[in-house]
Regions:
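Bacterial signal peptide processing site
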Residues: 19-22
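Exported/periplasmic cell-wall-interacting domains
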Residues: 87, 94-200
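Mature, extracytoplasmic segments of signal peptide-bearing proteins
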Residues: 27-36
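C-terminal motif of bacterial Sec signal peptides marking the signal peptidase cleavage site
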Residues: 14-17
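Bacterial N-terminal signal peptides that target proteins for export
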Residues: 1-6
């Protein structure tokens, strides 16, 4: 009789333990397994380029070296003078609303980009070598980490360059460096070039206290 009572008590304890144990979290960081373009016909023709401006250097997103999927990457000490050609891809709805590597929130409708080694936040002019179109983007994320791709543009930026349907394009990426006094260089040379039209908004110095402040979180670890 005592043995049956002990077995009954043990069984009850096991059931209680199972009922009180939390369910394993099988949720992913992303709700979509595959990236995709937004639904509907998004018109990017009237979308303005990112406006380069001076931003204080930040630690968030600039850890160097860092590792992704077992591979080590290094962040540049400075973006000044950077220019390189390679393959551009784009990212969209899967990542929309999620945090970037420096703690900002990715918006696929803004002119932004991800790069493996440029310091963030930063700016770059990206030119589609197949059709000559160019855009200016704000680099605030890390990637792409697939194959030999050079840069990931937001869906909006890719559409302005005309390759959103193909998925990738041959591009040239030239870093835009903005100095504290508002002067700029493109791939290490004065920008805009002498004689070129000047966009007053791009040259405007936001002044002390006007620099963007964000909650920043490191995204990668060794």
């Amino acid at each position: 009789m005592k043995r049956h009572v002990l077995l009954l008590v043990f069984g009850v304890l096991v059931l209680v333990g199972c009922a009180s144990s939390p369910e394993p979290d099988h949720s992913s960081r992303y709700t979509l397994s595959q990236d995709r373009a937004p639904s509907g016909n998004f018109d990017a023709s009237g979308l303005a380029d990112a406006t380069p401006r001076f931003e204080e250097p930040r630690r968030a997103g600039n850890k160097s070296p860092y590792q992704v999927w077992g591979k080590e990457y290094h962040v540049l000490g400075s973006n000044d003078g950077y220019v390189q050609r390679g393959t551009a891809s784009w990212y969209g709805e899967k990542f929309h609303g999620h945090k970037t590597s420096n703690g900002e929130v990715f918006d696929m409708y803004e002119m932004s980009a991800a790069h493996k080694s440029l310091r963030i936040p930063g700016y770059a002019r990206v030119t589609n070598l197949d059709n000559g179109r160019s855009v200016v983007v704000r680099v605030n994320d890390r990637g792409p980490f697939h194959g030999d791709r050079l840069i990931d543009l937001s869906y909006a930026a890719a559409k302005k360059l005309g390759y959103q349907g193909r998925g990738t394009a041959r591009v040239e990426v030239a870093a835009i460096t903005v100095n504290r006094d508002g002067s700029m260089t493109l791939a290490g040379k004065p920008f805009p070039e002498s004689g070129a039209p000047v966009d007053a908004e791009r040259l405007k110095d936001p002044g002390p206290g006007s620099e963007a402040l964000f909650v920043q979180l490191g995204a990668f670890s060794q």
